[in-house]
Amino acid sequence: MDTPLVTDDLDRTLAEQVLTLAEAARAADGVAPLSEHTLLRVRHGAPSGSSRFHLALEDGRAVGFAFVERVAGEPDSGEVVVHPDHRGRGHGTALLHSVDRDAGPDGVRVWAHGRTPQAVSVAREDGWTAVRELHKMRMPLRDIAGDEPGGPWEAPELPEPELRPEVAERVRLRPFVVGQDEQAWLAANARAFADHPEQGQLTLDDLLQREVEDWFDPDGFFLATAKDGGVAAFHWTKTHADGAGLTDGEPVGEVYVVGVDPEWQGSGLGRALTLAGLRHLRDAGLPWVHLYVDGDNEAAVRLYESLGFAMWDTDVMYAPPRDDAPRPNV
């Protein structure tokens, strides 16, 4: 087997092949193997020095792919996918080894989405260990019948969001305005996620790329703005036209990201904006909403459970064996 090709840039042909194999894996496994961020990097390219693309090739065609994002002072963060028709040939292991060899000074971590048997098997056989979990939670926005996927399940009540009087005097809730709110939102996002490298370091280019995606809807992007024009908190919702594995193709919603500026923590804005977004998705006629939350964020899990969400699935981040640890012979 050839060593995977490693590059800082993908030409259009390879990018299309990666998108095709990722869709084939999603259809076979029932879970998307690559995050939205990775797919945007494949489609639009990445800033110089920020990313690495690893490709397993057969007859010049991409049959396996790994993406690695580099953030200074943090371990590289990656994802790996192999086309369903080309599994069992060592491509997954070869890509993991390639990512590990190419890692930056702080090492590398790799996500496995949905705990698919193939991903878990490859990681364990090669000595990688789980170091982080990202829970997926779901909630119905209408009553789900017993003969529907996920049913039966009665939708919870979603009360109108209310702000405490002392908070309501200082902020107002409104939708995001394209061309006006980008910089204020980026500043608030960086403060809210200062300890979260994947989310907290989003750039203007990252935001603008999302604004031209088919799913983007500023009316579903809720801000709490202070009198000085700054963003105190926000809730960005998203609609998945393909059902995101929750339906047989009927669109569903997502709590895409909720953030609160540290100065506004404890104000109740997070809950109020979450409710505003959920009611927006419900009123759009969507049957389900889902979200992602870090496994160690117990406060957020409790908040979402209090609103009616329940655990659905888990993504797992793996770390490679220590340098002095023997690798299994696979």
Swiss-Prot record:
1D-myo-inositol 2-(L-cysteinylamino)-2-deoxy-alpha-D-glucopyranoside binds at residues 36, 198, 238, 254, 292. One of its GO terms (molecular function) is mycothiol synthase activity. Acetyl-CoA 1 binds at residues 80-82. Its EC number is 2.3.1.189. It comes from the Bacteria. Keywords: Acyltransferase, Repeat, Transferase. Residues 5-142, 171-328 form the N-acetyltransferase domain. Residues 142-161 are annotated as: Disordered. Pfam families: Acetyltransf_1, Acetyltransf_7. Acetyl-CoA 2 binds at residues 258-260, 265-271, 297-302. Transmembrane segments: none annotated. It catalyses: 1D-myo-inositol 2-(L-cysteinylamino)-2-deoxy-alpha-D-glucopyranoside + acetyl-CoA = mycothiol + CoA + H(+). GO terms for biological process: mycothiol biosynthetic process. Belongs to the acetyltransferase family. MshD subfamily. Catalyzes the transfer of acetyl from acetyl-CoA to desacetylmycothiol (Cys-GlcN-Ins) to form mycothiol. Monomer. NCBIfam families: mycothiol_MshD. This is Mycothiol acetyltransferase. It comes from Nocardiopsis dassonvillei (strain ATCC 23218 / DSM 43111 / CIP 107115 / JCM 7437 / KCTC 9190 / NBRC 14626 / NCTC 10488 / NRRL B-5397 / IMRU 509) (Actinomadura dassonvillei).
